Regions:
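Conserved donor-binding/catalytic core segment of Leloir-type glycosyltransferases
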Residues: 8, 157-174, 180-183, 194
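Glycosyltransferase donor-sugar binding loop
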Residues: 42-45, 167-170, 192-204
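Acidic anion/phosphate-binding donor-loop and adjacent secondary structure
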Residues: 103, 140-155, 204
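A short, active-site helix/loop in glycosyltransferases that binds the activated sugar's phosphate group
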Residues: 111-133, 141-143
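Nucleotide-activated donor-binding/catalytic signature segment of Leloir-type glycosyltransferases, i.e.
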Residues: 203-221
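Short alpha-helical donor nucleotide-sugar binding micro-motif in glycosyltransferases
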Residues: 219, 225-230
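Aromatic "clamp/platform" in nucleotide-sugar-dependent glycosyltransferases that forms part
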Residues: 238
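A charged, aromatic-enriched C-terminal amphipathic alpha-helix characteristic of glycosyltransferases
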Residues: 288-318
């Protein structure tokens, strides 16, 4: 039986960004199953691929089988969380990045369901006495659009034997400058560190050097190509909701290293996690791909971490 599902996010594809693309993937997968799917978003470019878009908060007063809020601490989501007690339709609040802000804590209290994907999510519910409202909603990627093609090294002139990659934008939490410092101090032989981002509003894009190549890239195809051709993907962020790029790395059979947070901590069996710059430096200097782990990581994504698994979990809430 068809369900009416409303997703809530601050900005929606085709704008670039992790949240924008992740909610698009969830919405389109939900639509493909014969449901009536809308998205409430502060910034969008109109209906997309059959998904209906709106910026009118009055849509919250309509009858929905489920309202799915993608995280908090941003304007549109916070408006829904703040008013969640007054909204008649059931709300699934996907924590994404656990927050102790007043509006997010209100969302924990007032929303009917709380979606968790990481160890940190479940621990946050336990600390706030709402563990019983938690439901598993696995982060996942769309396998139809997550496969990289060869060609990045040739296109961008990468001549070294090895290439380490980190993507996601030049935001303070991504710690790109700090990663460059660790890489330079490690003196990894015959290796280029490639950084990609689509936003440098803070002016913190690192300087280019012989073995460090920071790029401004809007093309998802180029980013996936970089991930596919990388010997190692590095997620050096101080904070992340999950880190979907780790799943993209695993799907493209690329090893990853990540600070022990969010998705990296949750999936530590499939990559290398660290808690200090020294641990990362030592790993880079001695890096050798583990073919067995690469295959296990790929198998895990294909069986447990695709967008169809995410939507399975969401729809299970109201089945």
């Amino acid at each position: 039986m068809s369900k009416r599902i409303l997703y809530v996010v601050h900005r929606y594809a085709p704008y670039p960004g992790g949240s924008e693309n992740y909610v698009r993937d969830m919405a389109e997968e939900t639509l493909s199953r014969g449901n009536d799917v809308w998205v409430l978003s502060g910034e969008h470019k109109g209906d997309l691929n059959g998904v209906k878009l709106s910026s009118d908060y009055n849509i919250l007063n309509e009858d929905w089988d489920l309202i799915v809020v993608h995280g908090g601490d941003v304007n549109v989501q916070d408006t829904v969380l703040f008013n969640s007690e007054k909204i008649k339709s059931p709300i699934l609040y996907l924590l994404i990045l656990p927050s102790n802000s007043p509006v997010c804590l209100k969302g924990l209290r007032d929303c009917k369901y709380l979606g968790c994907s990481t160890k940190a999510d479940w621990e946050h519910l336990m600390r706030n006495g709402v563990y019983g409202k938690g439901v598993l909603v696995r982060h996942g990627i769309d396998d139809k659009i997550s496969k990289g093609e060869n060609g990045f090294k040739e296109k961008y002139g990468i001549k070294t034997k090895r290439m380490f990659v980190s993507c996601g934008g030049y935001w303070h939490n991504k710690a790109m400058k700090e990663l460059v410092q660790v890489f330079n101090e490690s003196n990894v032989p015959d290796t280029t560190l490639v950084l990609t981002g689509y936003d440098n509003r803070f002016g913190i894009k690192p300087e280019e050097s012989e073995f460090v190549k920071p790029l401004m890239i809007d093309s998802r195809e180029d980013v996936l190509s970089a991930i596919k051709e990388a010997d190692l993907y590095i997620l050096h962020s101080y904070s992340e909701g999950f880190g979907l790029v780790l799943l993209e790395s695993m799907f493209n059979k690329t090893e990853w290293a990540g600070r022990k947070i969010a998705g990296a901590d949750t999936m530590s069996n499939y990559g290398f996690t660290y808690t200090s710059d020294k641990e990362l430096s030592d790993y880079m200097k001695s890096f050798t791909p583990d073919d067995s782990r690469i295959q296990r990581a790929y198998d895990y994504v294909v069986s447990e971490r695709l967008i169809k698994n995410t939507v399975d979990d969401i729809l299970k809430v109201i089945s």
